[in-house]
Amino acid sequence: MAKSKNHTTHNQSRKWHRNGIKKPRSQRYESLKGVDPKFLRNMRFAKKHNKKGLKKMQANNAKAMAARAEAIKALVKPKEVKPTIPKGVSRKLHRLAYIAHPKLGRRARARIARGLRLSRPQTKAKAKTEPQIKGKVKAQIKAQAQAQIKSKGKGKAQAETKPKAQAETKPKAQAQAKPKAQAQGKPKAQAQGKPKAQAQAKPKAQAQAKPKAQAQTKPKAQATPAAPVPAQAPPKGAQPPAKAP
């Protein structure tokens, strides 16, 4: 009896359109597009009939599973989960979520990174300048100590020279100050002495003038002869005074 053309085990794709036979698995599912269809078909028959080639089938099966997984990874694209900023959270968490957002926080992250970059060289520069600063401080301390020693020596020299200079300058200063003081004191003394002298001279002049005037008037009064007194007539019956012998 002749075999039916509809049940051939090889090259079934010729009669798909006529007999309604299913496509092999490799063509039936998109996930198995890259797998060899012959391998899948043979593996199916080996499960049922070929017990001798079980080890070979297992090895091939492992290869097929690995290829299938790779094909699935390549074909199936994972859906991108759009990040959302939660609402009704505290301000701090809201800010952190904004910075972590891939699109919205791009500028914020760039600004933070820039600030970090700018701050790093400053710390390095500080570390470099620390020994320089220490050297400068040491030099300043040495200079101050030397200046103090010099100032002490100058102070001693000045203390020794001061009495000499004062002894030399005192007579000069006195000699220069005397004519100046006399020149300044004369008009002041004259201006002050005039009213005092006048006030003192007035009572003295008056006191001297009074006795002089009295002394001049007294001798004048004495010098003038007294007027003659008329002689009184003797009373009647009275005897005249006797004449001296």
UniProtKB/Swiss-Prot annotation:
The protein's matches in Pfam families, at most eight in alphabetical order, are given as:
Ribosomal_L29e
Q: Give the subcellular location.
A: Cytoplasm
What GO cellular component entries does it have? cytosolic large ribosomal subunit
Bias class Low complexity marks the residues at 134-150, 172-226, 234-245
- Keywords in alphabetical order: Acetylation, Cytoplasm, Methylation, Phosphoprotein, Repeat, Ribonucleoprotein, Ribosomal protein
N6-acetyllysine is found on K33
Q: Region entry Disordered: which residue ranges? A: 1-33, 114-245
Q: Where is the composition biased (Basic and acidic residues)?
A: 157-171
* Residue(s) carrying N6-methyllysine: K5
Per the UniProt entry, what are the Gene Ontology biological process annotations, in alphabetical order? cytoplasmic translation
Q: Which domain of life is it from?
A: Eukaryota
Gene Ontology molecular function: any one: structural constituent of ribosome
Q: What is its main location?
A: cytoplasm
Annotated Basic residues bias:
1-26
Q: Which residues carry this modification: Phosphoserine?
A: S31
Query: Does the UniProt entry include the keyword Hydrolase?
Result: no
Would you identify the family this protein belongs to, as annotated? Belongs to the eukaryotic ribosomal protein eL29 family.
Q: What does this protein do?
A: Component of the large ribosomal subunit. The ribosome is a large ribonucleoprotein complex responsible for the synthesis of proteins in the cell.
| Subunit structure as annotated in this protein's UniProt entry | Component of the large ribosomal subunit.
What is the name listed in the Swiss-Prot or TrEMBL entry for this protein?
Large ribosomal subunit protein eL29
Please give the organism: Oryctolagus cuniculus (Rabbit)
What are the top taxonomic ranks of the organism? Answer: Eukaryota, Metazoa, Chordata, Craniata, Vertebrata
